[in-house]
């Protein structure tokens, strides 16, 4: 069973955004659609993240999982599209990515999975991290014994066994994670993976990047870079990477009403982080939320949520989702380029309790002319919500993406 493009257009007629009157730029338009109607069915597909598998007819592969409460995630599934995200197949479970009992009476699962295609081995590497639940189904051990886990889908479409990414750094004795994070694959097949980590006895986490080898079966850390810290609450979280031109960029979630950005020439050794600001120097006000890169060969963009007059009472200001172009030299956002990817629905000031909020999203370049942003609504009373997709139309082709 698939979700048809006809139903997309019928359910969201009039949501194409031509951006008339906006300054000439790379983003020509944004077209929004519903992938799965979780508000109606009660089955909410969360953490939708896709990657592109090249070929004569490229395939898109998405990982996603159901959510039934705050951080209460279930079996990780996969879906695919063979028509550039016009339709998606019914989600199917990935073997081994459900819950499993632990010796101390908990259940261990997997969440926050990000799939990415690895050209050298023609595999999809799907990486998330482990998560624990007690007998009542509530989140347990949120800050200890957490680590990255991954599965590999080979070129024949078969999923391998769940594996742990091992790291013997004593500064990561409590936990180390690469959850929801964008990675960068190098020309030689090595992979740059961003990590957030901390030792036992210390609450705030640091971030760094590691270089991994990958042979299509095993992922191994062989080198790590310098560490950034921010000793406020849980510190620095959920770093994501992008490469633009000859430089690497990392965006970082934080818990001091800021997000941070830094740049590197090799993807391992990073300049001092700085808060995300507008090009006039005013810092963005964020609330421990993710940011995601939206790369294009002619410009680097960031997708994010932030404080806005329309969302003052929405938890963590998690909607709207915005996009802006980055000034890669100054490491700031160009205010005049900001656009709304997913708008706020309802009244975020006087009736915020009824506003579906977002905040867990991902970007995927699907063709030279298009990228997509995928996310899922959360409605607090029911944890129901629709799974959403925004199609970004580029005014110029993205030369980093080949048709086949």
Task: Show where each model-derived region lies.
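Generic low-polarity alpha-helical segments
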Residues: 5-9, 115, 148-150, 293
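Beta-rich carbohydrate-recognition and catalytic domains
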Residues: 23-44, 52-108, 117-176, 184-238, ...
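N-terminal secretory signal peptides and thylakoid transit peptides that target proteins
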Residues: 1-15
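Conserved beta-strand position repeated once per blade in WD40 beta-propeller domains
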Residues: 47-49, 112-114, 180-182, 238-240, ...
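Short amphipathic alpha-helical surface patches that serve as generic macromolecular interface elements
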Residues: 320, 357-360
């Amino acid at each position: 069973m698939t979700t048809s493009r006809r139903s997309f257009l019928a359910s969201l007629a009039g949501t194409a955004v031509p951006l008339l009157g906006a300054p000439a730029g790379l983003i020509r338009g944004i077209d929004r659609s519903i992938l799965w109607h979780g508000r109606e069915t009660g089955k909410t597909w969360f953490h939708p993240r896709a990657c592109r598998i090249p070929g004569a007819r490229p395939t898109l592969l998405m990982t996603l999982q159901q959510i039934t409460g705050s951080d209460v995630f279930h079996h990780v599934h996969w879906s695919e599209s063979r028509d550039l995200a016009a339709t998606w197949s019914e989600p199917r479970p990935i073997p081994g990515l459900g819950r499993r009992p632990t010796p101390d009476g908990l259940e261990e699962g997997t969440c926050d999975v990000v799939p990415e295609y690895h050209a050298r081995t023609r595999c999809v590497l799907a990486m998330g991290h482990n998560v624990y639940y007690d007998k009542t189904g509530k989140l347990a051990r949120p800050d200890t014994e957490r680590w990255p886990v991954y599965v590999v889908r080979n070129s024949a479409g078969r999923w391998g066994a769940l594996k742990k990414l091992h790291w013997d750094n004593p500064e990561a004795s409590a936990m180390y994670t690469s959850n929801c994070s964008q990675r960068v694959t190098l020309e030689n097949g090595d992979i740059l993976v961003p990590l957030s980590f901390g030792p036992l006895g210390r609450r705030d986490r640091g971030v760094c990047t590691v270089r991994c080898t990958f042979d299509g079966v095993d992922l191994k850390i062989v080198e790590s870079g310098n560490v950034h810290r921010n000793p406020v609450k849980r510190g620095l979280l959920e770093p994501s990477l992008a490469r633009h031109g000859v430089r690497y960029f990392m965006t970082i979630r934080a818990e001091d009403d800021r997000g941070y950005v830094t740049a590197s020439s090799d993807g391992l050794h990073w300049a001092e982080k700085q808060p995300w600001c507008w090009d006039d120097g005013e810092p963005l006000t964020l609330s421990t939320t993710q940011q995601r890169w939206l790369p294009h060969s002619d410009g680097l963009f960031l997708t994010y949520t932030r404080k806005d007059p329309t969302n003052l009472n929405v938890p963590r200001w998690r909607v709207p989702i915005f996009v802006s172009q980055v000034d890669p030299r100054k490491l700031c956002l160009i205010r005049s380029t900001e656009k709304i990817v997913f708008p706020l629905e309802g009244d975020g000031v006087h009736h915020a309790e009824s506003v579906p909020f977002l905040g867990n999203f991902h970007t995927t370049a699907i063709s030279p002319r298009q990228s997509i942003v995928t996310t899922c609504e959360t409605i607090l009373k029911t944890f129901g919500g629709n799974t959403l997709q925004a199609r970004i139309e580029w005014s110029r082709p993205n030369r980093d993406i080949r048709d086949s």
